[in-house]
Amino acid sequence: MMVIPSGPIQDACCDYKSIESIQSDVFDKIQNLVKTKFFRHYRANLWKECPFWNEDALCTNRDCSVATIDEETLPLEWRKAALSAIQLPPTKGRLLMPSQQKCTYKDQDFCLVDDKLDSDHVVYIDLTENPERFTGYAGPSSARVWKAIYEENCFDIVHRMTEGCETCNNIMNLGDSSTKHRNPFAHVPKDKAELHQFLTDLAEESDGSNEDEVCLEKRVYYRLISGLHSSISIHICDEWFDQETGIWGPNLKCFVNRIGTHPERLQNVYFAYALLLRAVNKVGPYLEHYEFRTGSLKEDEKTSYLVQDLIKSTTSCPPTFDEKSMFRGSEAHVLRQEFKEHFRNVSQIMDCVGCEKCRLWGKLQTVGLGTALKVLFSYEDNSLNPITNPDLFERNEIVALFNTFNRFTESLNAIQRFRDIYLDQTSPKKEELLAENKSQSYIQPYVTKLFNQFKSWNIPLPNYIKLLI
């Protein structure tokens, strides 16, 4: 079968099979949760200026636009007038540069959340009405965003994280442009040799990383960024718009080109899922007594039940990631600060995305991963109590965390769907099987008669006849 990784997930505490099993168990639960009133409404500023370069390549495709909702229809506690106690001076639509952002985030934060910034320009969005999918946004604008992330905010380790893998290729194709990269899977694997090489790369123990050169913290950071990028690509391929038929649906060629040509990207989706799963599990006690304040007691109770039911499923398995293994030793403090600064920059770079809907989901999932990192690395287990520490997380952070977990859950589900499509395209056609069965049923009586005749003569049956039996 295509794309079935096996063995342990590098830098995590579980294997691929366990993650797929957990994903199957929680899929329906997280799907139901993100449709609730609390989790489907997200607050964002989609019109900040890009703080790093002049970005005017806005997508004009109607699929790029985001439909907002009237905030007057939402609970009072969620509205602009009910923001947290942090009051910020007006920024006139501009995002402050890092040197000016001393008051825009806490030291525990790994990213910038719109709730704390420029409250005059934020809007509410129903995420179920604005799904993440193919919009046609691509080209120089999109490439510039990812180039800035990988080249300037990834510890300069992209090359080393893909060394030693024959079919791997770093995301930006950096390096000597005169060297032609081997890319044997620009199409669906068509024979056992290609498929074997692909699966071998998936199972490679090191997947290109050199532990002597790249420390754990930097590897984890890179895997998260790559996993996010790969997950977004999977969503685009899974909900692809066929311009000829006018139908939305999965595009196998897109998936193979974006993910199948780079086995390490698939690995990193699983890794990011393992980290998110651990964060959701760890934040469970905090949400046990959390007040969702949807404006309806019945809705609050329903939301709380769905959250606890989901978290209960995550506690049924051993921890999938060990956060205590990170940021230890003499360089721990420096590494932690660099890690945060890089990830905060990534959250700002999402304001440079030229497609409104892509920007929305890029910002949300960056906040979601940032919240997961905050849960894992900023607080001990006994600190996660909403009664004694009620203001640890903004509402937006909780919404982003679970929606990001859902997006990665859907990515793993899409991988299974693409496997099935691949098998359907490469397996013998139904008509061929029927014709073969019909042919066999026609000659079988004659073969049986011949077999009995040879047996009565004590003559060994020829091999070519044995194959027909």
Per-range role (PLM):
Residues 1-469:
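Extended non-catalytic scaffold regions that mediate assembly and binding
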